[in-house]
């Protein structure tokens, strides 16, 4: 394809402030898109993971864990990702709950989807720290997890995104920081979410889209207040301070370009997932360009 010809691509990402911050320049056309159009769809990450199984979107936000099972259809872009330190999922519960004193009862854990990176980190963590504990998984939308734990419909909850900042207000306590566990284990940042592109779009198109996303990140860093209403529009009634915390935690230099350290982190995550049988082996290249 000649990338200078006008063409519209289906672009999907989440309503979370880190994604809307990264893509606001594209969504509001605050940068030159060079004749490329985007039909934008916004949904939660697990819904996007499921949509990618059917290759619903041309460019899509995915959890790294989901991408590991979709490499026959999608390849990874080096821009737009969420990696970082101190920003991994938290395992929370009500005060007094623990894995050490289960009374032989099978525990219930609410998670933001089976295909999420958070769930994979939970499985890695449990195999490493509590291999003897039995648990039942209840997948649900991330915004429903804390209420489920608070209302005793689940013993534990795996929380992501803005949940990191608000769980104490719901009377919940942290049981484990799975991001910290990963960092201690590997010495690398936590691979959380990524932007992937359909393999059949070809190298030239993939690289062009990657460049646009990188320029969008640059614009967002340089002009953080432009398009702020777009972020707020999708922020699920978050307070401005929580939105700012969210962006500061999940958007960083890795969002512009993974670089060597980011590549090492992603490679380590996939190696760990393959070793534990959670994603298949493949000879396909990981990166689109």
Task: Report the location of each language-model feature.
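Extracytoplasmic small-molecule ligand-binding "clamshell" domains
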Residues: 18-22, 31-63
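Beta->alpha turn/N-cap motifs
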Residues: 44-46, 55-68, 141-142, 159-165
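Hydrophobic/proline-rich hinge and linker segments of small-molecule sensing/allosteric domains
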Residues: 76-99, 183-200
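Bilobed "Venus flytrap"/periplasmic-binding protein-like clamshell domains
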Residues: 4-28, 89-156, 160-162, 264
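Secondary-structure end/capping motifs
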Residues: 202-272
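Pocket-lining segment of extracytoplasmic ligand-binding domains
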Residues: 140-233
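A structural signal for short loop-to-beta-strand junctions that line the ligand-binding cleft
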Residues: 9-10, 73-81, 108-109
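A local structural motif
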Residues: 31-41, 126-140, 279-284
């Amino acid at each position: 394809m000649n990338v200078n010809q006008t063409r519209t691509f289906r672009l999907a990402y989440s309503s979370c402030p880190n994604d809307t911050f990264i893509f606001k320049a594209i969504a509001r056309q605050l940068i030159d898109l060079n004749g490329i159009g985007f039909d934008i769809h916004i949904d939660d990450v697990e819904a996007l993971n499921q949509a990618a199984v059917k290759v619903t979107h041309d460019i899509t936000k995915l959890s790294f864990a989901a991408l590991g099972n979709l490499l026959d259809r999608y390849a990874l872009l080096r821009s737009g990702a969420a990696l970082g330190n101190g920003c991994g999922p938290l395992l929370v519960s009500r005060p007094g709950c623990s894995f050490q004193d289960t009374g032989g009862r099978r525990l219930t854990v609410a998670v933001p989807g089976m295909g999420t990176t958070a769930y994979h980190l939970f499985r890695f963590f449990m195999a490493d720290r509590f291999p003897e504990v039995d648990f039942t998984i209840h997948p649900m939308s991330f915004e429903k997890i804390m209420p489920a734990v608070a209302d005793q419909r689940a013993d534990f909850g795996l929380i992501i995104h803005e949940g990191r900042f608000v769980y104490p207000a719901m009377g919940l306590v942290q049981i484990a920081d799975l991001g910290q566990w990963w960092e201690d284990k590997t010495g690398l940042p936590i691979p959380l979410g990524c932007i992937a592109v359909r393999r059949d779009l070809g190298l030239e198109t993939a690289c062009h889209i990657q460049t646009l996303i990188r320029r969008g990140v640059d614009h967002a860093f340089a002009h953080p207040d432009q398009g702020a209403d777009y972020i707020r529009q999708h922020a699920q009634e978050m307070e401005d301070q929580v939105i700012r915390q969210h962006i500061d935690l999940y958007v960083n230099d890795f969002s512009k370009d993974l670089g060597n350290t980011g590549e090492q982190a992603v490679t380590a995550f996939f190696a760990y997932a393959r070793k534990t049988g959670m994603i298949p082996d493949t000879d396909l290249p990981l990166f689109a360009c």
